Amino acid sequence: MNKFDEFVEATDKELHVDTSTRNTTINVSSPGSSNDSTSSPKSPSGEVLSRKEMKMKQFTPKKLNYQDHPLKDHSTGGSLPITRRTSRSSTIHKRKSLLQPIVAPQTPDKSGPSWRSNGGSPSGSFNRQRSTSGASMHSRSSSQSLSLDSTFDVSLQNLANKELELLESKRRIEELKKQLQLEEQSYQKRVEELKELKSQVSNDLQINSQHQQQQQQQQQQQQQHHLQPHSKKREEHTRDKSRGKGSGTGSSSVWSKPLAFFNQFDQIIQHELERSLRWDDTPEDKIMQPEPYEGAAAVQNSQLRQPQVEIPTSNSQSNVNNTDNNDNKINNNTNNTSNNKNGHDDNNNNNDSSNNNNNNDGNNKNLWSFFNDVKTGLLGIEEEEETPQRTIAGSAKNDNGIKEFKTAKKTRDPVEMTDFQK
């Protein structure tokens, strides 16, 4: 409820008036006529008529006459009887509110106004009529109806707005569906175009690759045709060079190694001659003679010296003869190698590379045989060359066939004899 309705109900309770209906009449009695008004008339059927049930016709506002003007001077009266009517101006300034009419009692006029009684009631109470203007006839029912109307209008507006929103959403959904269909169609078209482009590109690549392969094959064939004579010439040239180098290197390798061997042999021979002739010994040590050796034992005991009671001249002469024989052998072998070298050169000029290899093998065999001869001559492995004159005083054999040598230390002290067994 509104505050206005509460105010209306409160005033109705105070005045004992029901303002829910508009066509109601209120009879207000004066104090003098209170007794008369208390006695309510009874209907023939025995029902008591209350004040609230007494109705008055609704008056419409009319234009006031000059006589009804409130500022008119009533002292200068005429012969006409003055009839006083309840005016709106007399009650409007006594109201508490502009919207709620207030009923106030009115004293009777001395001039004897004519009162109208509703239904011919004999009571002398003053009847106050309620104003029936549109502004003052506001009631609780009208406020309730207005509130209901306002809520109904609001609900209708909300309903209409919701329906419009739903329609707009449907329209948008349809538009989006159409857009999706268009996008799908465009996508399918693009996919087809892409497939076509791929097929075109693959075909172009295959054609280009085939052309490139053909061009490469043609270029390779042309290069082979151009390079075949050059390659043949180069191969022939390399073969010639290899043959020349093989002959040169073969001869150089064949004759460089024997020369080195010859130098080594020469040094070994000189060393052995010096040891055999005792060029490094002093005259006092000439008594100490080297013991002759037999095989490898002679090499180990070459540094051992032993005294000899009798120094035969045949030993020195045999040693000198052996050295001369060795020198003669070396000279003969060198001559043979030089002859072989000359023959090898002639064969290189006349024969092919196969003959050169055979000659090289033969030369190597000759050189190794010469090396073996020199070795046997230097080390004295052959025992047939030994003569019975090369016996040493003091040498003897045991029962087991082992030779025993008596040697002395190389000192100026008296000779100390020591026994060595072999």
UniProtKB/Swiss-Prot annotation:
Stretches assigned to coiled coil: 155-208
GO cellular component, one term: cytoplasm
Entry's localization field: Cytoplasm
Signal sequence residues: none
Keyword field: Coiled coil, Cytoplasm
Compositional bias (Low complexity): 29-45, 131-148, 210-226, 314-341, 348-366
Domain of life: Eukaryota
Biased composition (Basic and acidic residues): 65-75, 233-243, 400-422
Main location: cytoplasm
Pfam families membership: TDA11
Bias (Basic residues) ranges: 85-97
Region feature Disordered, mapped onto this chain: 15-148, 203-255, 309-368, 382-422
Residue ranges with Polar residues bias: 114-130
Similarity remark: Belongs to the TDA11 family.
This protein's name: Topoisomerase I damage affected protein 11
Origin organism lineage: Eukaryota, Fungi, Dikarya, Ascomycota, Saccharomycotina
